[in-house]
Structures are given as structure tokens and as C-alpha cells.
Design a protein with these regions (language model features):
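Short, Lys/Arg-enriched anionic-surface-contact patches
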Residues: 2-32, 62
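Short alpha-helical "recognition helix" segments of helix-turn-helix
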Residues: 47-52
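Residue-level recognition of short, structured coil/turn motifs
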Residues: 14-15, 54, 72
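Helix-turn-helix DNA-binding helix
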Residues: 56-61
């Protein structure tokens, strides 16, 4: 059974939710892109991700699995990787 995750829990995981919810700032766009790419790779639907990213500062019912693959290795995402590294804390893999 997957666990529902709130904005507070995302913050506890090290995700800069204030920046994530900011509009019209390049860093926010890059962070949203990085988070979206990670969640798409994990099989979440674009609609679910869009709902989560477009919420205000209310609690969000959202599923997020903790993995140790939070950082990109693809050179295409080098700039985003650097930003994400500052905003996210790697999590140990689930047993």
C-alpha cells in the first residue's frame, strides 16, 4: 500500500516546496521540471503530477516513493541536477 504524502512531508524529504510552488522564476521552473521528470520515470501520471505542482500551500494527497535515485546522471539534465542537489536530500532505498 502506498503512503499519502503531504507538502509538509515533501519538505521533510528536503524538497524546497516554497520554490516548487513559486511561479515565473527560472529556478522554480527548473525544479518543477526535475521533480516532474523523476516522478514520470517512477510511473506517475502527468495529470497527478500537474495537480500536485499546481496546488497552493494546502496539504496535497500525493504518492511519492523514497529512492536513492533522486539525482540525474544524464548530461542533458546537468543544470537541473545541480539545482536539485541543493533542494533534495537523497533517501535510502526501501527494504
Amino acid at each position: 500500500m502506498k503512503k499519502k504524502i503531504s507538502l509538509e512531508t515533501l519538505r521533510d524529504l528536503g524538497i524546497d516546496t516554497e520554490l516548487l510552488m513559486t511561479k515565473n522564476r527560472p529556478e522554480a521552473v527548473d525544479l518543477k521540471t526535475a521533480v516532474t521528470e523523476q516522478l514520470l520515470r517512477r510511473g506517475y501520471s502527468k495529470a497527478s503530477i500537474a495537480r500536485m505542482l499546481n496546488q497552493d500551500h494546502r496539504i496535497v494527497d500525493y504518492y511519492l516513493r523514497r529512492h536513492n535515485d533522486l539525482f540525474y546522471t544524464d548530461r542533458t539534465y546537468t543544470g537541473v541536477h545541480n539545482l536539485v542537489r541543493k533542494c533534495l536530500t537523497p533517501q535510502p532505498p526501501l527494504p
